[in-house]
A protein has these predicted regions:
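Metal-dependent phosphoesterase signature
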Residues: 1-7
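Asp-based, Mg2+/Mn2+-dependent phosphohydrolase catalytic module
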Residues: 9, 13, 19-132
């Protein structure tokens, strides 16, 4: 059973109206069996990628679903400093770090933009990324 953070479904619904969303997971849950599954155009699991994030295979498979975009035009949202942030950053993908625990940045590469609450996600993306 997967419990969603407050505001996740509303944020995904709002974002799916303007963006193509994909789920990249190291887990084994079928995103399409969850209430939020309808907002995703594609989902890539570790089984499909034959590896786990931060390995670039997840991100390369996502790119195949987005053939008209460059990595630099993509935005990856994740909560893990290595699996999500480092993995995407290594390919030049913009990253937005979900830091709901207000953890300290412990890596030796650039700290990405961060957010703490899913209710604010759509506004943050609009303010920080739509004009870039």
């Amino acid at each position: 059973e997967i419990e969603l953070f407050p505001g996740v479904e509303d944020a995904l619904k709002a974002l799916s109206e303007n963006y193509m969303l994909g789920a990249l997971t190291n887990g084994n849950a079928d995103i399409y069996k969850l209430s939020i599954g309808k907002y995703f155009e594609f989902s890539i699991s570790s089984l499909e990628a034959q590896n786990s994030k931060p390995n670039k295979s997840h991100f390369e498979l996502a790119k195949k679903h987005l053939p008209n975009l460059k990595y630099s035009e993509m935005l990856h949202i994740g909560d893990h400093q290595i699996n999500d942030v480092f993995g995407a950053h290594a390919l030049g993908i913009k990253v937005l770090w979900f830091n709901n625990t207000e953890a300290l940045w412990e890596q030796n590469f650039e700290k990405p933009d961060q957010f703490y609450d899913w209710h604010s996600l759509a506004k943050i993306i609009e303010e920080k990324y739509e004009s870039r």
